[in-house]
């Protein structure tokens, strides 16, 4: 049976790292201590994979905060671990809801403004304001008078990152005949509500607020994709990895962003692989490299939503059968990644080591000049990273096929 040719890895791939990461690696390489450098690289990789992200979700009582949290976590109200929902305020104290697939990301359901036992003047202290990396402020319907704690609005006005969401605006949607065709009327209504919310927040002292009109029941429509993009943009660089992976795959653009970010992570992993090879311990490099590759491939499988639960939820959202979506997936990562899968991928890789080595030298040029041994090991061993780079494209392409099959139409 013929083996399909793997897509080539681009020649101009570069390892992107934060300034502090580069300085730490420079110090480790200059010391000439291989075990120290290997330990430092493993630490940097682990930190990027386990960075915590805390998101506070607050707003008016009964505004739909819990439903929005469930939508962002890809859960329905009846799913195990879902946030409690109801027509009245159900949150009396900050309640953490870890992401079901990425436990380092936690969305906090905060008490609504005006809820019993939560006074407006002490709101920041009661919800532990400093805990959160940024806020989602939820307001129902037309945003009214934006009934949010003044202290919270003032803190946001001073630069605290936040986004306002209106998840229940669809309840006021009625396409009057006088406004023309349905699509035109809906677009006009969307803009009217955005303008109204913007003006109310400016009156409250918030300059240039971001407004997103979303539907908790239809996370693929309206402003939800723009909310996802803003989430990624607002996160600090060191928390972007966790934040982006945790977001639901609600568009082809979201899938592409995940692929780009994971591609950078692959090349960081290549550094670890190359330095481990330089350690004088027989068999260590091969064993570590295999384990690292298996973990990476399993991460891609989970991140792109190719597991059964994720496909079932996506099918439910768009009114399709899960089997129809799975039928278009052609990735070997559509099933659980095993050591046998890794061996098969290794056998299909022939020229990855030199390309990863070139990316290694472009990202950390000090290694080639100051530590020839590590540079040589980077050329000879990271075949697994070439496998990762190539097969990272495969699940990304597979994950996009269900979206293309759905072919959503109308106003997004």
Curated annotation (Swiss-Prot):
* Reactions this protein catalyses: GTP + H2O = GDP + phosphate + H(+)
Listed GO molecular functions? GTP binding; GTPase activity
- Phosphoprotein keyword on record: yes
Q: Where in the cell is it found?
A: Cell projection, Cilium, Flagellum; Lipid droplet
EC no.? 3.6.5.-
Record-annotated residues binding GTP?
Answer: 60-67, 85-89, 215-217
The top EC class is hydrolase
Q: What is its main location?
A: other
Q: Name one GO biological process term.
A: positive regulation of flagellated sperm motility
What family classification does the UniProt entry report for this protein? Belongs to the TRAFAC class dynamin-like GTPase superfamily. IRG family.
Q: Assembly and partners? A: Interacts with PLIN2/ADRP and COX4I1/COXIV.
Its annotated function is as follows: Required for sperm motility and therefore male fertility, via positive regulation of spermatozoa fibrous sheath formation.
What name is this protein filed under?
Interferon-inducible GTPase 5
Q: Give the species this sequence originates from.
A: Mus musculus
Quick one: which gene encodes this? Irgc
């Amino acid at each position: 049976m013929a083996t399909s040719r793997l897509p080539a890895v681009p020649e101009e791939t570069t390892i992107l790292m934060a300034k502090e990461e580069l300085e730490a690696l420079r110090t480790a390489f200059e010391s000439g201590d291989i075990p120290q450098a290997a330990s430092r690289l493993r630490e940097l990789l682990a930190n990027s994979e386990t960075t915590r992200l805390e998101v506070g979700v607050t707003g008016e009582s009964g505004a739909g905060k819990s439903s929005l949290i469930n939508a962002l976590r890809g859960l329905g109200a009846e799913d195990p671990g879902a946030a409690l929902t109801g027509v009245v305020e159900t949150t009396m104290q900050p309640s953490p809801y870890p992401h079901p697939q990425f436990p380092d990301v936690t969305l906090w359901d905060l008490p609504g403004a005006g809820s019993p036992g939560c006074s407006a003047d002490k709101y920041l202290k009661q919800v532990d304001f400093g805990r959160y990396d940024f806020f989602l402020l939820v307001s129902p319907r037309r945003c009214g008078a934006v009934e949010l704690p003044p202290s919270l609005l003032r803190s946001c006005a001073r630069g605290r990152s936040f986004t306002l969401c209106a998840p229940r605006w669809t309840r006021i949607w009625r396409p009057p005949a006088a406004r023309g065709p349905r699509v035109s009327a809906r677009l006009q209504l969307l803009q009217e509500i955005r303008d109204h919310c913007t003006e109310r927040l400016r009156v409250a002292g918030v300059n240039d607020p971001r407004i997103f009109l979303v539907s908790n029941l239809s996370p693929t429509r309206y402003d939800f994709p723009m909310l996802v993009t803003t989430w990624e943009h607002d996160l600090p660089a060191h928390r972007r990895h966790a934040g982006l992976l945790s977001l639901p795959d609600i568009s082809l653009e979201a899938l592409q962003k995940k692929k780009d970010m994971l591609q950078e992570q692959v090349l960081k992993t290549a550094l670890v692989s190359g330095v481990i090879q330089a350690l004088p311990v027989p068999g260590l490099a091969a064993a570590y490299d295999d384990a690292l590759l298996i973990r990476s491939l399993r991460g891609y499988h989970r991140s792109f939503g190719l597991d059964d639960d994720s496909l079932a939820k996506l099918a439910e959202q768009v009114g399709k059968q899960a089997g129809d979506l799975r039928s278009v997936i052609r990735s070997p990562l559509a099933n659980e990644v095993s050591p046998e899968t890794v061996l098969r991928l290794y056998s299909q890789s022939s020229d990855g080591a030199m390309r990863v080595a070139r990316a290694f030298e472009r990202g950390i040029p000090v290694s080639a000049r100051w530590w020839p041994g590590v540079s040589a090991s980077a050329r000879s061993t990271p075949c697994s990273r070439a496998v990762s780079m190539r097969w990272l494209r495969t699940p990304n392409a597979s994950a996009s096929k269900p979206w293309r099959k759905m072919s959503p139409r109308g106003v997004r």
